[in-house]
Amino acid sequence: MTLTIDHVPIARSDLDAATEEFTRVGLEPEYGGTHADGTTHMAVVGFDDGSYLELISGTDPDIEPDLWPAFIDADAGPCAWCISVEDVAATLQRVIDAGVRVDGPQTMARERPDGTRAEWDIGFLGEPGSEKFPFTIADRAPRSYRVSPTESVAGGPLTGIEAVVAVRNLDASVEAFRRLFRLATPARAEIPEFGAAVASFPGDPLMLATPLDDGRGTWLTERLDTYGESPCACLLSTEDIQTADEEYALREPTEWLDRRVAWFDSDELDRALGVVSRSTAAAGR
């Protein structure tokens, strides 16, 4: 099973406010419509590689969202991550055979503002309530019904998404992901500015992060205590972080293993959404 990121949901209590903030930093989303159950709606920032950020919120403050209610209520940002697969049912069977619990398949849908109906199958991996492992998705309708490149990023320097997943035990989590997805041995480093020890899997859009115990990781410990093991950040890949800085509102980059990361210049998005260079050589600024 390969790790091809389909999308990362970003939980916000107010979709209009989230859209305004993303637009301010240069990532203007497009409204995507309401999910079939009517309790959530979303906006999309779609990249050229087909991946996208999904800003998701409840449709009515008096009705609990069916998806990620605790994350949405608290404006928690990244709340899950999704990978594309050819066949959800077949993928879930392989995961069961590997000894991991699953839920699904389920069929979901969303109606776009123009009336187009997108439909897809999804399946969840791992224990109920945990977003440590990705959920899986396969389209029933043409993928373009669900997402296409968004004007604010199409043809630009941002080329895709990498997920940073907060975990409690880095060693055990590395082994679990390597066993399930056949990943290479990760590179590891402590990143003081992020307050975490990070493992990055070469060639795959995944990093695992566990809090440093020197006080700098307090924010990440609190996030784990509140939401459990789940994504804590999204990094948007770029070949040229300097060009990305010219087009989007970014803070000064910092070292990130053998790469560099620049967080978006937003208190709401700090340490939750950034840009990552593909290599040190491409990261000059």
Predicted region positions:
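N-terminal low-complexity or amphipathic/hydrophobic leaders
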Residues: 38-48
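Glyoxalase I/VOC metalloenzyme domain signal
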Residues: 1-5, 10-30, 47-188, 192-285
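Short, solvent-exposed beta-strand-to-loop segments that form ligand-recognition rims
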Residues: 34
